[in-house]
Amino acid sequence: GVLQFSFIGYNTTEENIGGRTTINVTLNSGVINLGEVVAIGYGTQTRREITGSVANVDEASFNKGISRDASDLLRGKVAGLSITSGSADITQGSMIRLRGTSTLMNDQGPMIVIDGVPGGDMSSVAPSDIESISVLKDASSQAIYGSRAAGGVILITTKKGTGARTTVNYDGYVSMDVAANKPDMLNAAEWIAVNKELGNYETDAVQGIVNNYHADTDWFGEVLRTGFSQSHSVSLTGGSSTSNYRASYTYLDRKGVAKNNEIKRHSFRFQIQQRALNNRLRLTLDASGTLTDLSRPQGGDFIRAYNMIPLYPVYNADGTYFEGANGALYNEYDMGNPVHAMAENYDRTKQNIFTGRGEAQFDIIDGLNIKVDLFKSRSSYDQSVWNQATNYAGAGSNSNATRNNWSNDRELMEWTLNFDRTFGDHKVGALAGYSWENNEYASHYTYVENFAVTSMGADNIQTGNNLKVGNATSARNAYKLISFFGRATYSYKERYMVTATIRRDGSSKFGKNHKWGTFPSVSAAWGISQEPFMQNVKWVDDLKLRAGYGITGNQDGLSPYKSLELYESYGTYITGGSTQTAFRVSQNANPDLKWESTSMFNIGLDFSLFHGRLGGTIEYYAKKTKDMLYNYSVPTPTYVYNSIAANVGDMTNKGIELTLNWNVIKTRDFDWTTSLTLSHNENKVTRLSNDFYSTSAIYTGNPWIRGQSGQTSHIVEEGRSLGNFYNLKCLGLDADGHFIYEDVNNDKVISDDDRTYIGNALPKAEFGWTNNFTWKNWDFSFFIRGTIGNKVLNNPLAAYGTPNYIMGTNAMNNEYLTKIHESAKVSSFWIENGSFARLDNMTLGYTFDTKKIDWLSKARLYVTAQNLFVITGYKGLDPEVNYSSTSGLSPGIESREYFPKSRSFTFGVNLTF
């Protein structure tokens, strides 16, 4: 006979009786585990108890392969969470947005909270140290973090020690990266053929090149390479009945596909917890450190790779670097040997982050505890940039060097009192807290030219002889944040649940008339599946309707002294026969400066069906941001300075999100689980002006097309969304190869007055689709993600897709190269469909049976391929450009400085001893 075992939230398991009288069975959680403990602000709740919108991603669901930081683990896993990177520069982090952009200035995205400490840095946590990540998506769950939560909140929970036996884990991988794509530039024969077709071949300029240079150089092939990466992580966990500990060390060494693009990182983390007084007192100590060395090529190197003519060689006949006759290329527009520059110049950074945290928690009585957290961190950044006089980057200045240093010290103290008791069918919870935070920042910047001694580069900056006024600066600032916060929760039989929170923040950043802000929220949930009338509906495990409303704030756009009148040095004057430094006002005071405020309504339906085999969430949200910060022009002498930062604008974001998890097949040996995330967001700017400060529109975005300086690509105005491309609409080419532009105002003259809306860079939808298969000891997974409905300005094609400068530079191989007979302008001609579907990750692994090996608990080998292919109609390097360049106001431009994205192949091993 066969026995079937089932329980709500767990997969059904069948066992053959086979004459046995005792059968031990372990049930695995379904795709939706209702008992899963999820981190929320200043606490945890089970998934069934949550009334707000919270998405949780555990280690088993993280993206596989190479990860720069925690954001790579989340990419495509949470509906409404957009994580993009325009370039393959491995030293740069990703741009993160949750439910759209909600500010006009300095959008930092979601606030990062690491082990309960707000304001963290994702790069300070090694991906192998992360246990789970929770994303607080609506204001009812975010409001507990007040004036810093309008962009969303991401809670990172690191792995902790256990009371079990001592365990050693090793995770390591090696990886090879190749450029997934590179610009299709003309080779030598094609460059000659195009110039012949255009009638340029007999000109002195072209003949001078053809007669003197005979190479066929692939300049992008010269500045790119095969990258190699390795990562090794070792952790030690253990403990006893009253204590536990975990210590870990991770080493990462990555070499990107662009030469000089490298990162080396050492990360360590240590945590110990001691319990005393019959477990009523719990003491925790955490310490972590991250030491990172970064190296990146300079953006100009890739511009030169676009420009350099393929007949030019990399080296002269004597082995020296080619730079034209007597360095003639130095005097030409954006020309020079990028291989030479990469060999001599550098941009190196040392970035260190150290943190320490102490926590004491005491149970006063059953259900009531008090906790104090003390936290200290220090971050430092030391950048050295050197450009040698013997290549184009330093020739005009006889070598130049930059040293840029900053440090940030942060202190945090938080007290919380937490009550959590159950009285029959009633569960009651309450939280009260106080937070004090101090931040101090110091920086120093020096730029020097004209070096007599170059052997030490930027490390011998005192040998420079041309330190100009304004090229040596230093600064120091500080700000404090004091907060009071609270939360109350109530649940009746997990059927009716209510949560209310409030936070009051006082920040030294705010103007003197608005030092304090209050941020409340309320949410409720109805556990429909817990109603008596649902008890006979056996295929429904959980059905919960949630709704919430809250207010959060954003102070990212405020520097510590933004509300004050500031002065800066401005030249010199002579008095009493001596020269003195002059000063002038550099910023108007605004005592009414305050936080941006975002209110959000959210309604969602959570469901789990068929014993956890099918589950998911569908949600609708509507959020409105008001009092958005922006720098407005003001008249002088009414004001001392010609601009002022003020809270004026309003913006809305509305959207729908869907998450589905389905355990399609579940047998003894084979399992198939599929997950889908889908999100749609609509953005609109509803106000930019008031009675005191006004602007008709914000023209922004640098299209960076040769001969088109001063042009903009985007517009921000009332009644429309962000991301609008705004310039000339091209109707095609005439018989002579000239662009035909729409005469919008019918004045028979094409000018800026004919600019119109020519596309939007924001996607209409984003999706992620994950599939996981297991068969006996084998596992296989693949992950596809993408966007629908967004446009991209193909800047490289606009810059190099016409023949206007081909006698002196290279051009891109495209169908219009010999058909266009005028310079490119910013227009719809260069705007393309940016929708795409990317096979982002594919992994095959095998877990060995280690039951007969006493000293080995787990052994798994795997291979992973990342960015295997992209399905898209976009003709540029990659359709996934940074959606939020220039603070989110001009997204969707592919830059000529972007590194090509890489395709990675990884071999890894996981061992547990």
Predicted regions and their residues:
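Conserved small-residue
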Residues: 169-214, 445-447, 646, 663-761, ...
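Extracellular/periplasmic, surface-exposed regions of secreted and cell-surface proteins
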Residues: 62, 109, 115, 227-230, ...
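Short aromatic-centered micro-motifs
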Residues: 5, 112, 314-315, 421, ...
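Acidic, glycine-rich flexible loop segments
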Residues: 200-214, 229-231, 301-340
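Short, small/polar-rich motifs associated with maturation and membrane association
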Residues: 1-285, 290, 355, 447, ...
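C-terminal beta-barrel architecture of Gram-negative outer-membrane proteins
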Residues: 746, 780-839
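Glycine-rich, aromatic-lined ligand/substrate-binding cores of catalytic
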Residues: 760-793
